[in-house]
Amino acid sequence: MPVNIKXFNYNDPINNDDIIMMEPFNDPGPGTYYKAFRIIDRIWIVPERFTYGFQPDQFNASTGVFSKDVYEYYDPTYLKTDAEKDKFLKTMIKLFNRINSKPSGQRLLDMIVDAIPYLGNASTPPDKFAANVANVSINKKIIQPGAEDQIKGLMTNLIIFGPGPVLSDNFTDSMIMNGHSPISEGFGARMMIRFCPSCLNVFNNVQENKDTSIFSRRAYFADPALTLMHELIHVLHGLYGIKISNLPITPNTKEFFMQHSDPVQAEELYTFGGHDPSVISPSTDMNIYNKALQNFQDIANRLNIVSSAQGSGIDISLYKQIYKNKYDFVEDPNGKYSVDKDKFDKLYKALMFGFTETNLAGEYGIKTRYSYFSEYLPPIKTEKLLDNTIYTQNEGFNIASKNLKTEFNGQNKAVNKEAYEEISLEHLVIYRIAMCKPVMYKNTGKSEQCIIVNNEDLFFIANKDSFSKDLAKAETIAYNTQNNTIENNFSIDQLILDNDLSSGIDLPNENTEPFTNFDDIDIPVYIKQSALKKIFVDGDSLFEYLHAQTFPSNIENLQLTNSLNDALRNNNKVYTFFSTNLVEKANTVVGASLFVNWVKGVIDDFTSESTQKSTIDKVSDVSIIIPYIGPALNVGNETAKENFKNAFEIGGAAILMEFIPELIVPIVGFFTLESYVGNKGHIIMTISNALKKRDQKWTDMYGLIVSQWLSTVNTQFYTIKERMYNALNNQSQAIEKIIEDQYNRYSEEDKMNINIDFNDIDFKLNQSINLAINNIDDFINQCSISYLMNRMIPLAVKKLKDFDDNLKRDLLEYIDTNELYLLDEVNILKSKVNRHLKDSIPFDLSLYTKDTILIQVFNNYISNISSNAILSLSYRGGRLIDSSGYGATMNVGSDVIFNDIGNGQFKLNNSENSNITAHQSKFVVYDSMFDNFSINFWVRTPKYNNNDIQTYLQNEYTIISCIKNDSGWKVSIKGNRIIWTLIDVNAKSKSIFFEYSIKDNISDYINKWFSITITNDRLGNANIYINGSLKKSEKILNLDRINSSNDIDFKLINCTDTTKFVWIKDFNIFGRELNATEVSSLYWIQSSTNTLKDFWGNPLRYDTQYYLFNQGMQNIYIKYFSKASMGETAPRTNFNNAAINYQNLYLGLRFIIKKASNSRNINNDNIVREGDYIYLNIDNISDESYRVYVLVNSKEIQTQLFLAPINDDPTFYDVLQIKKYYEKTTYNCQILCEKDTKTFGLFGIGKFVKDYGYVWDTYDNYFCISQWYLRRISENINKLRLGCNWQFIPVDEGWTE
């Protein structure tokens, strides 16, 4: 329910109730009181500047800066007049009303009001409540006409002030008393926010898609309501005493778009939400959780002994009930309170993971930063928040009626310029560094040359002391030891709907005795530093190189030069790292008649040189190199710069780095195993827990290495990438300027005869830079991953293996020591220990960062290098090749059919010329009984012939084989079985098979693509995995030596059905046994894509006929119901006999996906991608084309979809968005409809009512659109069975009915 928010004018009279004179704890002197307004119970606004801990001169920009990393906005005159204070008050009230307009904001405010700080703190005797302490109360002056003023205490939860010295610095905190912080110790405290609603931070638009043009990044300004909600989340943490104080966390990643990389407080990461909390290690996460749990228990213990109160009017029983409700304690029959672990867990997750900036941004339709580390641009200011044509309570800046909702255009600086104004430069301060080197000029005699550099432009290297030391700690393992992991998911819907999170209390009287003990308060001290720091350097850094590529805006007759010093000393010269040919061409003066051809030549040369890349022979895990990076940024020494490619091949990725960081790889702390004499169960659990904790050690070590890599290595690589963008942009601007200068030399008559579009020049140059940046992205990403995998992970694995060896010894000794009690379990436990500790735990980058680009590069690294692929078939440029690097050659028969869409599929028919032979290198032949290997491929086999099912089930035919002298291996098919067979030199064979059902209504395998991976441990088992999951395992130890041919044959052999065929793709052989994690990862890598799939697993296509299949209601199809122009459902028919069963699929309406006019699909193919905007047409209702429409003015949660001839009736809407909400690999997709501010919902099958004026009709199980699904898809329960999941079925030769 909405909370009650009061409205005020600043000049309203004092009433000693909700308008008072408040003595702030930031009191600058005795007797100072500020006018305060209670807009919500226990929440007050004080329209005054925040001065607590600050000196008066610190409010001026000229005295330096507080922070090295952000723009600081100063205006000492702000909030000085009553008019400004009135505007501040009314603006804050409007922001609170905006927050109060959504259920999630209502719940946030409700919980803040109810979360009354504990009456006391660490200095309060445990058996007492104390109201007149600094973390609970504040003083107010009671003003009564004709009477002496009185001072009373006032208990509050939150006081909001205007900004401190820096208007762009919003901040939330409370009191530190005698070295203790109640907001971090479970007590909670009265919170204070310093806030400036009129100052808006500005951030870059961030696209996760690697292919997004760098020039499409836009600047967006914040919605002050979301900024305020961010601070209110801090308030909620503080009121519950779980606010995390002074715990800096090393940044997760320094992406291309990220700016500030210093360690960030954990409190900010939790409050922001999204992916940011993932940077916090599981052990740190658990330590924070356990501290909060212990603090809650301490509060419960205090409540159990409280018997008196300091301060009048304190009802002890009432406050005990208040705190029982607040902390969700349980009470036993004796009235004793304690923490229920499940209740605490729920409350903690709601507070830490439910209320986050990212969650709330989604609820309110507000654009926010992608990450807390995102780049900030100079802030802006607005004086128009009270103007409802600029900023509304329900929509903020993104006002639909002004066409500002789409793509958050209301927050887009370039679009909504009337909403803000720029801040004048004299009010903005940023920390800068002057990098100076001695130099002497002949003419001026200057003795130094300085380049001004912003602090955030420097390379960031995290301090080694900021990394966790937890790995080195010894641990005691007991039978009840738990893992250090926390589930950090809590949806915003749970917050809104969960009544357990609402205390429902009646607020107690807030008046108390005045607070007098100011000596207990620790007043903070804030120190400024100079805004400019000068440092001297000996040589030229990349900053000199970048500066030499810039030029003053008013310069004329600009020229390019290959000399750095020439450019630094002459303002009309720009340093270029491209060839002398480009320099000479650009500097050539040409006549007007040659101008157009000259421009084309300059641009062509720039395109050719900027997009150049070379391949590398000696560094196998880096596939390309950008040779001009060295001379562009002064990377490497002088020799390396001049021949960057050779230097890179010798020195590897390390030569790109400014600093080689010191890597911290601690010795892993040992385990002490708890002794349990005679207790068999406890002994076994202790062993099991030790193995689980061992796995956690591996995870934590990898996490530590990734944390160091991201913040000491990857940050350098990404800084290089960003500088290369700057460098290329500098080159482009210089060329544009040179072209402009050349054009301006001509007479007006000559200009009239020159046909040239300068916008086209700009476009072509930017297009070249985009292509170049994509190449640089690939190169830099590969370098970073290479450094991680070659220089860092091996060191970690060595330490972990040493730990495993010691743990194995200790566990086996522990088993022997307890042999008497374990009896027949001894050998089983020893085998378990040996098996568990035999293998390393594979490193998976996706567990430690959400950076999709880095994960993609890592996955490529894993699949192409670490997995030891010795044969990998790919279809490129119209031919089949081996992309493993081992150079197998191919013979392809004339009756093999290729489909280059979908990873190079090929079709084998049952004919003599439908065959492929891959001739392998002799270096990869396996002819030893001890050689392990794996094969992996995808297959699609057609449906059986209904009339000849016995032949289908009995005929076994080979599809892939590698046989030499009757020894080797083969893959064969026998009906619904996939069979793997190994044959040794003595003709002894061993087979393992996977069998799927042919009696399911809807099969997951018949005519559908599925992945098969077979792994072979010659001293152990052969395993068959289907779609990444282990299905069967058989021992192959008794086989003798196996010959393998140099040739791998793909051909249907011994197949009796002449019409039979199979499709195969993604075939790989690996030179070792892949483990389960690698198989699962390989399946994920191969199947993950932004293209959507049809029912069979092929790419979904535009302009193709499809029948619809509903995953939630599989036994129905959709047909046309003409009476109401809608889709109704009918049951699918089955074909069923003793051997087989299946449902008919080609039933009902036939749909065609069409590109919508505003589709984001910019590819030239006809593939449907996730997020595309589409129309959904129907071609079998009548002779004319029909389309699916949504009624624009519908107010129903769930309503019909209209099927009507294509028209432009404004009462209907037809633009849809095709989505894929689940990360799990699935062929399902969802169809969303939104228009302006309205979300209609997702397509589904549901029930709704239609009003015909004279009668109501109820329609059940009809084609509908529903908002209900949007909530359900965010939950984890059976989401794949929801009725909003659709698959598109094309007619296919492999499925006949």
UniProtKB/Swiss-Prot annotation:
Q: Where is this region: Translocation domain (TD)?
A: 446-862
Q: Which cofactor does it need?
A: Zn(2+)
**Pfam families recorded:** Peptidase_M27 (PF01742), Toxin_R_bind_C (PF07951), Toxin_R_bind_N (PF07953), Toxin_trans (PF07952)
Q: Explain how, and how many, cofactor molecules are bound.
A: Binds 1 zinc ion per subunit.
Q: What is this protein called?
A: Botulinum neurotoxin type G
State one molecular function term (GO). zinc ion binding
What gene name is listed for this protein? botG
Q: Which keywords does the record carry?
A: Disulfide bond, Host cell membrane, Host cytoplasm, Host cytoplasmic vesicle, Host membrane, Host synapse, Hydrolase, Lipid-binding, Membrane, Metal-binding, Metalloprotease, Neurotoxin, Protease, Secreted, Toxin, Virulence, Zinc
* Record carries keyword Metal-binding: yes
Which InterPro entries does the record match to this protein?
A: Bot/tetX_LC (IPR000395), Clostridium_toxin_transloc (IPR036248), ConA-like_dom_sf (IPR013320), Kunitz_inhibitor_STI-like_sf (IPR011065), Toxin_rcpt-bd_C (IPR013104), Toxin_rcpt-bd_N (IPR012928), Toxin_trans (IPR012500)
Placement of sequence motif Host ganglioside-binding motif: 1266-1269
